[in-house]
């Protein structure tokens, strides 16, 4: 059942009843939510707005069938921003699954390959994109890398922290132990195609929260229901990112006061 956790959630639910109705169907049975936070961060870049951890939890807490919400994210040791985010996740009441972020060194040393070889480029460029490049472009890029090599730069560093295995295992264990009826996955990665199919074959409900059009084909082919997260933007984005027209409706007095203060 939907019971607004805050007054703002209540007012927004009155403005966006269809979104709440759709969520009500998704959460009509006991549900557990599994969030791949790295995926969410990538979505933010595409969407142009951000997920507010506190507001997101308030929305989830408005549905009494949600049993747990687990966020999977890496911890970058010694990084203040990473530490603050970990604390925020815990303070908001999420279940946290974390592990240290690994710093991977990727070679960009082209000294041992022909100038028209994409061998080094393959290590940090997507294959589909690389296949679109002609030989001349590959040569130009390799020349740029060669110049970096002459300056002493022979590798780049990339942060790695993948939780696909942990998330998949947790979902399947919950399914095997009959811990819940509905599995709500926040990710669009192809690695989840197999766990989703196993959950569906077990007679359980699986729902994918993702950005429409940004779901891996393998996952899409499972037939899993996809909920477009853009439908809940106003419920979960930073308050400053709520459109002014919506702010005027949920708090007209404050909006009027703010407009009078504006130069």
Describe the residue ranges of each PLM region:
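Polar low-complexity intrinsically disordered regions
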Residues: 1-7, 258-263
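Domain-level signal for Mg2+-assisted phosphodiester chemistry and nucleotide/NA-binding surfaces
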Residues: 2-139, 152, 156, 201, ...
